[in-house]
């Protein structure tokens, strides 16, 4: 790899899996990717695998020009880690642009669908994405069933089950990520309220 090349970095820690993907800047070709289940030590593992992937591909941190991150809803720890790493990276490397997308939208591999992430206590985060609608709600399981029946033409995606490839998911959603001008304004969406 040439150290002058430019890259995109994707980090997702939202839901039971650590996902890191490096893309070539101009072509979006996948340079490297990692997807592993994580139960504990997410902070250490995220930093370790991120550093390992950069070293393995002989990339300097300054060669990352766009940082893509999912902001939840997701676990408290996962979302905090992802947003802190993304904010810190873009503050340390001001030429790196920050992009964010909620996990509900990210879970949908195509333009339209219903996305669900369970958060326990008979509650679900739900995203409805159609030609006319793009909304996120916290709803009961009963209301989720009603929503699916009322929109039965839309495919349903649940808890990141049956994901074939996170890099394909990233590439199909890359245009949905929103640019965050000020990294300090990046805020995660949690599955549950943090304990005070």
UniProtKB/Swiss-Prot annotation:
Organism: Mycoplasma genitalium (strain ATCC 33530 / DSM 19775 / NCTC 10195 / G37)
InterPro entries: ATPase_NBD, Gcp-like_dom, T6A_TsaB
GO terms of biological process kind: tRNA threonylcarbamoyladenosine modification
Name of this chain's protein: Uncharacterized protein MG208
